[in-house]
Design a protein with these regions (language model features):
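A detector for small-residue-rich transmembrane helices and their helix-helix packing motifs
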Residues: 1-248
Length: 248
């Protein structure tokens, strides 16, 4: 597995993410905050820009963060890119990343509204903009970075197309079917989103990437022209016709 060839899109995504991580570290020592520029800010914050919904997924918050994400991309990206082919894989990856960012923005708006409702007696939805103006500095601190949302979408796709494949997951000493790994991941992210509010992890972004990926796969399956290895006129790809498998 270590010597397998990494397909073009997966390889370029790995390279871009590592380049951006190094650039973030280098420019930080020069007094330039790339995370502040390219990370996804809360949409009511002064530093929010629309392009951040795209750029945030190529930024990471630390060595452990990028290592885990790129390991997931290296593990599952080549399989799905080989099955879908490059154009379709890239489209799916970006949609999951955008969807994750969108869900994170909704989650932050809900969090902001709850905080205001708890601290301001008689707070109503109409008072939101007044509170935004009063808390601009605080809102700028809400910044989301990472490819996790897109990668959770890739993980979901792997589970939907290859549900009975087995993989080792720490701390289990035996391999688990991928469909159970996916179910466990969803349950864990839901629990974490509800039970932990200050752990610094965008759990709802992870779930958002999975949600948008699920919707997209279901759409493709309802439109045979788009399903399987094809993507409209850009179809084609390998297919193991000698092996039958069940999928979700």
């Amino acid at each position: 597995m270590l010597t397998r060839e990494i397909p073009a899109v997966t390889k370029n995504l790995l390279i871009i993410n590592f380049i951006m991580f190094i650039a973030t570290w280098v420019t930080e020592n020069m007094g330039i905050d790339l995370t502040g520029l390219l990370g996804l800010h809360f949409f009511l914050a002064p530093d929010f820009h629309l392009y951040q919904i795209f750029t945030y997924m190529f930024m990471h918050g630390g060595l452990g963060h990028i290592f885990m994400n790129m390991f997931m991309l290296w593990m599952f990206g080549p399989v799905m890119e080989a099955y879908w082919r490059s154009r379709k894989f890239f489209f799916y990856y970006i949609i999951c990343g955008l969807g994750a960012g969108f869900c994170q923005e909704l989650a932050q708006f809900g969090q902001f509204y709850i905080i205001c409702n708890e601290q301001v007696p008689g707070f109503t939805f109409a008072d939101t903009m007044m509170e935004v103006r009063a808390n601009q500095g605080l809102l700028n601190l809400w910044t989301t970075v990472g490819a996790s949302g897109a990668l959770y979408g890739i993980l979901l796709a792997y589970g939907m197309y290859f549900p009975n494949e087995r993989m080792f997951v720490i701390p289990f000493p035996f391999p688990l079917k991928v469909k159970w790994v996916i179910a466990g991941s969803i349950a864990l992210e839901l629990f974490s989103a509800i039970a932990t509010t200050n752990d610094g992890v965008a759990h709802l972004a992870h779930l958002g990437g999975m949600l948008f990926g699920y919707i997209l796969i279901k759409y493709w399956r309802k439109h045979p022209f788009m399903e399987g290895n094809g993507f409209g006129k850009y179809g084609g790809g390998w297919q193991n016709t000698g092996h039958k498998r069940k999928s979700w």
